[in-house]
From Swiss-Prot:
One of its GO terms (molecular function) is RNA binding. Reduction/oxidation of cysteine residues Cys-23, Cys-45 and Cys-104 and a possible intramolecular disulfide bond involving Cys-23 and Cys-45 give rise to different redox forms with specific functional activities in various cellular compartments: 1- fully reduced HMGB3 (HMGB3C23hC45hC104h), 2- disulfide HMGB3 (HMGB3C23-C45C104h) and 3- sulfonyl HMGB3 (HMGB3C23soC45soC104so). Belongs to the HMGB family. It comes from the Eukaryota. It is linked to Microphthalmia, syndromic, 13: A form of microphthalmia, a disorder of eye formation, ranging from small size of a single eye to complete bilateral absence of ocular tissues (anophthalmia). In many cases, microphthalmia/anophthalmia occurs in association with syndromes that include non-ocular abnormalities. MCOPS13 patients exhibit colobomatous microphthalmia with microcephaly, short stature, and psychomotor retardation. The modification N6-acetyllysine is found at residues 3, 30, 43, 112, 139. This is High mobility group protein B3. Residues 9-79, 93-161 bind DNA. Residues 182-200 have a biased composition (Acidic residues). It comes from Homo sapiens (Human). Disulfide bonds join 23-45. The modification Cysteine sulfonic acid (-SO3H) is found at residues 23, 45, 104. One of its GO terms (cellular component) is chromosome.
Length: 200
């Protein structure tokens, strides 16, 4: 089942994919009533492909090349970057972390070091419990820092939109945000888990 934009061009096929498609069509013609056993069929195709000469494979190579040209042309007309996502502008301001994520970035390494082999889910659960057990005054430093980062982010976005590029201002806030973002990007799965824990 295709996901996402139905207008997105069909993916390009490899020479082997064209070969398998041809084998499937041959099978249907010879045995229209016999359903294809996918595992067995794939194995036979693979074995047959390995024994074919370069000359025999060349027909499928040409088909794959033609399909690549078709795909590249359609993708160019289609617009969005591969995968249906717009390419991220590396200079665009990055979304700032919340107070909870700042807390997580500080305590996640400590939990991992004291609990070797702990799963992502358990780390997130522990972080969620720790955060929920903090009183307001203990949470305040993280919330204040997050608010400052958000304020700077909003200014950066305004700059970015007005100038068409991001003014790469240096400063402790940007450095702190960059550090947190790098860690967050590396552990996106953990963030998703942590968001759930924070909401509970």
């Amino acid at each position: 089942m295709a996901k996402g934009d139905p207008k997105k061009p069909k993916g390009k096929m490899s020479a082997y994919a064209f070969f398998v498609q041809t084998c499937r069509e041959e099978h249907k013609k010879k045995n229209p009533e016999v359903p294809v056993n996918f595992a067995e069929f794939s194995k036979k195709c693979s074995e047959r492909w390995k024994t074919m000469s370069g000359k025999e494979k060349s027909k499928f190579d040409e088909m794959a090349k033609a399909d690549k040209v078709r795909y590249d042309r359609e993708m160019k007309d289609y617009g969005p970057a591969k995968g249906g996502k717009k390419k991220k502008d590396p200079n665009a301001p990055k979304r700032p972390p919340s107070g909870f994520f700042l807390f997580c970035s500080e305590f996640r390494p400590k939990i991992k070091s004291t609990n070797p082999g702990i799963s992502i889910g358990d780390v997130a659960k522990k972080l969620g419990e720790m955060w929920n057990n903090l009183n307001d005054s203990e949470k305040q430093p993280y919330i204040t820092k997050a608010a400052k980062l958000k304020e700077k982010y909003e200014k950066d976005v305004a700059d970015y939109k007005s100038k068409g590029k991001f003014d790469g201002a240096k400063g402790p806030a940007k450095v702190a945000r960059k550090k947190v973002e790098e860690e967050d990007e590396e552990e996106e799965e953990e963030e998703e888990e942590e968001e759930e824990e924070e909401d509970e």
